[in-house]
Structure formats: C-alpha cells, structure tokens
C-alpha cells in the first residue's frame, strides 16, 4: 500500500494482499493465528477436530504458496439461452474462458469435453508473453468453436488445462477441511428449454455465481423448464444451374465442412456444393491464404464477387458432393444473456483486447472517419476499428479484403494499408480512383475505388483478412508460402498502387534501425510524375537512409520537362533493372507488385537474365 507497493507474482492472493501501517522483521516464522489456521490444504481424512487434536495446522508441507492448475468457462455465461434455429445451427458457437497455473508455469493446453471426458477438443490459447525470466504470471485466455447441434446433444461442457510440468485437473472435487484449492474440471450444465413460444433453446447453468450471489447447478436453487424436442429437420440444399456440375452423390453437413479448414484439408461451399481445394492451394494465383481464409465455410457470395466464369468452371474439378442444410422453420434471434452475470464477466472480456483481424474468416465493421484528397484521383481514407484500443493485426506484407454491397452485389478488392502496423484504433488506405470514361479498355472505371470515393464520412465498410502468401517478420526474414526465407538485399519492383506492400515493408525496415540491415532497391513505375504515390515519403527516407533505401522512378511520359526529370522515361527494361537493383544471389530476394503485363513481360524475363532463381527468389504480391 501507499507509499510503497510490492507486487510478488505467484504468491497466492489471500495470503499476500495486505494494507500495512508497519512492517516488523523477525528472525523466525510468524506465530499469528491466521498464518497457521488459514490458507492450507490438509489431507481429505482430516476434519477440524482432528486437525486441532493432532496439530495438522502447524505442518509446513500443507501451506499454500503457489496456485495449482485451474481453468474456467466464461462463455456461455450462467443463464445464457442459445436458440436452436436455422440461423444459429449454420454457424459455430465460440466457447471462451481462461486458465492459469502457479509458480509462473506456462499453460500449455486447454481442452474441452462435451461427452463427459470420453473425447477432448484442444482449444486455441491466447497467452500473454512471458517475463524476461520466462515466467507466465497472467491468465491464459482460450477459445473453441463448437457446433450448436453438438451442444444440443451434450449434457454438460467441461474444461481442463495442462501446464508445462504436465499437471492437469482432477475430474472430481477433492474435499478438504478449508475447502481450498479446488481445481476439478469446471462444468457448465446444458438443458433444453422453451425461451419463446414454438421455439427451443439451450440454457447454460454454471456451478455457482461470483461473489455472494446465489444460484448455479451446485446449489440446485433453480428449476428450468425443459422440453422434449428434436433438432430441426434436415433437408438437402438445392443445386444451382450456373456450374456444369458432375454427378457426385456424397452429402455433407456444415459441421463436417468446418472440420476441413487447414492447409492439410481445405474445403469450401459454393452455391450448395462442397469442394475440396486442398490440391489447388499451391497453384492459386493469389496464394494459399486466398483459399484458407474461407476454408471450412460457405463462401458463395465472396467467390462470386471476385472470380470470373473461367474460375467458376475450374472450381468444378474439385467438387466432392453437396451440402445438407437444416430447415428454416425457426427465427434468427440472437442469444439471450443473463444480465446480472454479464456485469461480473465484463472485466474478464475486456482484459485482453484481441487484434481486429483475430479471425480471418470474420468480417469486421469499420467506420470511415477521415477522407483526404491528395490529388485529382488519389484519396487517403482513415477507417476506425471496432474498438478504439485495438490494432488492426495485419502482418507486414499481407493485405485485407475491403467488402461492400454495390448495386446489390458483393464487391471485394484487396488493399494494403499504409498506416503503421501498431496504429491503435484505426488504419489508413491510400487509394487511386479509376473514374469512368478515362481508360478505353475500362470504360466503367473501378467499381470499388469509385464507391469508396463516393462514401461520406460516417459510412461503414466491411474488412476481412489477413490474407496473402508473404509476411515480413523483421531483419531480413520472410515467411513465403509457409517457408522461411532470409535476404540481406531486396529488389522491389512495382507499378502504380502496387507500391503499398513495398511501402509497408520499407516502413518496417526503417523503423527498426539500426538493427535491421536489409538493403532495399526500389524501382517504381507510373504513367507520369503526378501519378507517383507516396513520393514525398519515399524521397525523404531515401535521403535519410541512403545505405538502406535507394529509389528509382520510371514514367511513361514527362508532363513538366522544364522541371528537369532526372529518372527514367519509358518502360522497366533490363538496363534499368541492372543499374538499379542488385544481381540475383542466395541473399537477394525480388518482390514485385503491379499489373500482370508488367510482371509477365517487363519484370520476370529481365530478372531471369540477372541470375535470379525465379522459383525461390522471386515473389509476386
């Protein structure tokens, strides 16, 4: 307490939290009553009478100094009701909670069972970083997606945790005279109820309630109205005529599809058909992430938004069956929560704010809070994140999908933010607007860029990600298609708005000075000098860090020759690249982003002439 506060992590709170007026240092252990008669775990056969008669209180081996391994379910909360209908059964329910162990030991895994311990599901852990001494003093939050119909058939949900010493929790409560250090499986009972007329649901019952509140299944104070009700009937989804589908007779539930959401097995659903895209991961032009971001889901709308008829025909090669869906006889109400319990759980839920892009399969709702016109056709947009204390959570080198409904259809386009990765509460997009009737090959202009340009401040868009096959992890290290790659020199060649992923990497390298020794050689192509995006920043950085960044511009035509253009005019040629980017080698990596003809005819063949290993040292964003 004031004026001195000492925090001793790992020591049990009940023993060590004190407000002190004075401290007395003694040569021997305290003989205070509470030092001996509290915070002890005596053997199960010892009751209060025996403990007093045989002086069990004074045996040092039973004192509590460290917590034991424990875990708790916080979501679903007590008295929460989950309706069973066509809406809720088509998406997973996310269980959440926390776990901890004593002595600074790391929680290594958390498991949930829905069948009384016959089988266990491994949860996704979200641990805090350890201290510099390798200790873990904070709660480890965890989550697990489960099928709603699996919850309906379960009698209870139970959780247990393991720590790095392979300690785990006992199945049943072990009695001791003080009732302390109980760490058996945390169980939440499930019961079928009738929350509304004609509807069934699952109500969740915790063992007890926080503080002095009464309730919970252990107290047996509340009787739930139960109903014998079957799950909604199943019906087969209707086939759609837009694809030339083959006669594949297998049928799959959405629950089965969701199990195939990894690099080892990637299934998707499009228009009621199930496709196994695992073999196509390595060949997808946008990288494996473009498929994995939707693996295990129904991505019909998104697939239609960004794929051509040719791609739709190609998809049919991977068709394995049809989707079985539930009936639609129930309403789509959201879960109903017990309000009193929510107030107790709120601090737990707020304690760790996950990055906005914590789940690549979910869209986040972002509000336009700033819009700046940098030139006739270039805009800088600022979007706020769902929470003001969040970061976007986009790894360096990856990009996001911006999603919007335009003229009644979903439109999705990939963008790389120009804001720093650790910006809190918002992110920035630099967008070149392609207007109608300005390019003969594209008379309608850019659908998404014109839409963004038309948005008033206060409007919302949806964002999804991260996706992409390239990630810069710092100090010359990359992860490319899941494989580690290190480079001390980067050849960065881009055109137009393809500067944004390069800009993100340049920004990361220069922020990590002097530790990051990566050399960057940027060749940036545009139509005119007025089309060069982020030129002020690039020129400033090149002047400030001449040993780290070299910039060379290439334009088709000079608009103002009187200003003395000192860079290249024309195309990105072999001569330009030989002069301004390093030759290929084991420590050199080429990064490219631009229009496909530029990649195919200007960059790839010329880098190959410069001894680049095009399979391992050339990456296209």
From Swiss-Prot:
GO terms for biological process: nitrate assimilation; nitric oxide biosynthetic process. The record marks 593 as: Necessary for efficient electron Transfer. Heme binds at residues 284, 307. Residues 361-473 form the FAD-binding FR-type domain. SUPFAM superfamilies: Cytochrome b5-like heme/steroid binding domain, E set domains, Ferredoxin reductase-like, C-terminal NADP-linked domain, Oxidoreductase molybdopterin-binding domain, Riboflavin synthase domain-like. Transmembrane segments: none annotated. Binds 1 FAD. Binds 1 heme group. The heme group is called cytochrome b-557. Its cofactor is FAD; heme; Mo-molybdopterin. Its EC number is 1.7.1.1. Coiled coil: none annotated. FAD binds at residues 413-416, 430-432, 435, 447-449, 497, 500. GO terms for molecular function: FAD binding; heme binding; molybdenum ion binding; nitrate reductase (NADH) activity. PROSITE patterns: CYTOCHROME_B5_1, CYTOCHROME_B5_2, FAD_FR. It catalyses: nitrite + NAD(+) + H2O = nitrate + NADH + H(+). Keywords: Disulfide bond, FAD, Flavoprotein, Heme, Iron, Metal-binding, Molybdenum, NAD, Nitrate assimilation, Oxidoreductase. The keyword Disulfide bond applies. Residues 249-324 form the Cytochrome b5 heme-binding domain. InterPro entries: CBR-like (IPR001834), Cbr1-like_FAD-bd_dom (IPR008333), Cyt_B5-like_heme/steroid-bd (IPR001199), Cyt_B5-like_heme/steroid_sf (IPR036400), Cyt_B5_heme-BS (IPR018506), FAD-bd_FR_type (IPR017927), Flavoprot_Pyr_Nucl_cyt_Rdtase (IPR001709), FNR_nucleotide-bd (IPR039261). Nitrate reductase is a key enzyme involved in the first step of nitrate assimilation in plants, fungi and bacteria. Homodimer. Belongs to the nitrate reductase family. This is Nitrate reductase [NADH] 1. It comes from Zea mays (Maize). The lineage of its organism: Eukaryota, Viridiplantae, Streptophyta, Embryophyta, Tracheophyta.
């Amino acid at each position: 307490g004031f004026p001195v506060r000492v925090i001793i992590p790992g020591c049990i709170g009940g023993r060590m939290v004190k407000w002190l007026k004075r401290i007395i240092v003694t040569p021997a252990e305290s003989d205070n009553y509470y030092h001996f008669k509290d915070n002890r775990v005596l053997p199960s056969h010892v009751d209060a009478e025996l403990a007093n008669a045989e002086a069990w209180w004074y045996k040092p081996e039973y004192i509590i100094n460290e917590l034991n391994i424990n875990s708790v379910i916080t979501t679903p909360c007590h008295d929460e009701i989950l309706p069973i209908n066509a809406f809720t059964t088509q998406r997973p329910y996310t269980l959440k909670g926390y776990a901890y162990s004593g002595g600074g030991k790391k929680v290594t895994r958390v498991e949930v069972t829905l069948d009384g311990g016959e089988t266990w599901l491994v949860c996704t852990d979200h641990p805090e970083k350890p201290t510099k001494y390798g200790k873990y003093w904070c709660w480890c939050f965890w989550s697990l997606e489960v099928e709603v119909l699996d919850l309906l058939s379960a009698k209870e949900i139970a959780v247990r945790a393991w720590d790095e010493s392979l300690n785990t929790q006992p199945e049943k409560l072990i009695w001791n005279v003080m009732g302390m250090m109980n760490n058996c499986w945390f169980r939440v009972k499930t019961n079928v109820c009738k929350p509304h007329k004609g509807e069934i649901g699952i109500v969740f019952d915790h063992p007890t309630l926080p503080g002095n509140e009464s309730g919970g299944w252990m107290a047996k104070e509340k009787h739930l109205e139960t109903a014998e009700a079957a799950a909604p009937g199943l019906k087969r989804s209707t086939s759609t005529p837009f694809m030339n589908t083959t006669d594949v007779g297998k049928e799959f539930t959405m629950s089965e599809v969701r199990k195939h959401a990894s690099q080892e097995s990637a299934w998707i659903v499009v228009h009621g058909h199930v496709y196994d895209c695992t073999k196509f991961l390595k060949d997808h032009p946008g990288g494996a992430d473009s498929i994995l971001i939707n693996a295990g889901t129904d991505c019909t709308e998104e697939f239609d938004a960004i794929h051509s008829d040719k791609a739709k025909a190609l998809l049919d090669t991977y068709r394995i069956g049809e989707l079985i869906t539930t009936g639609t006889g129930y309403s789509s109400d959201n879960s109903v929560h017990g309000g009193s319990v929510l107030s107790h759980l709120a601090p737990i839920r707020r304690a760790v704010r996950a990055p906005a892009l914590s789940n690549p399969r979910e869209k986040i709702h972002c509000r336009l809070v700033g819009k700046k016109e940098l030139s006739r056709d270039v805009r800088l947009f600022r979007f706020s994140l769902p929470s003001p204390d969040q970061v976007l959570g986009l790894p360096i080198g990856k990009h996001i999908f911006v999603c919007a409904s335009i003229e009644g259809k979903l439109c999705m386009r990939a963008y790389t933010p120009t804001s720093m990765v650790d910006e809190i509460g918002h992110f920035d997009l630099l967008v070149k607007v392609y207007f109608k009737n300005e390019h003969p090959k594209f008379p309608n202009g850019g659908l998404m860029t014109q839409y963004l340009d038309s948005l008033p401040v206060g409007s919302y868009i949806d964002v999804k990600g991260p996706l992409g096959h390239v990630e810069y992890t710092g100090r010359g290290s990359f992860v490319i298609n899941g494989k580690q790659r290190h480079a001390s020199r980067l050849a960065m060649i881009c055109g137009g708005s393809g500067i944004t992923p390069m800009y993100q990497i340049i920004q990361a390298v220069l922020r990590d000075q002097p530790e990051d020794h990566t050399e960057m050689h940027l060749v940036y192509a545009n139509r005119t000098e007025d089309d060069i995006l982020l030129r002020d920043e690039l020129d400033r950085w090149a002047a400030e860090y001449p040993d780290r960044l070299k910039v060379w511009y290439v334009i088709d035509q000079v608009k103002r020759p009187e200003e003395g253009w000192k860079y290249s005019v024309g195309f990105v040629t072999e001569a330009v690249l030989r002069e301004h980017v390093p030759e290929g080698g084991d420590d050199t990596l080429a990064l490219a982003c631009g229009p496909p003809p530029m990649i195919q005819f200007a960059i790839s063949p010329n880098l190959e002439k410069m001894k680049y290993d095009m399979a391992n040292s050339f990456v296209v964003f």
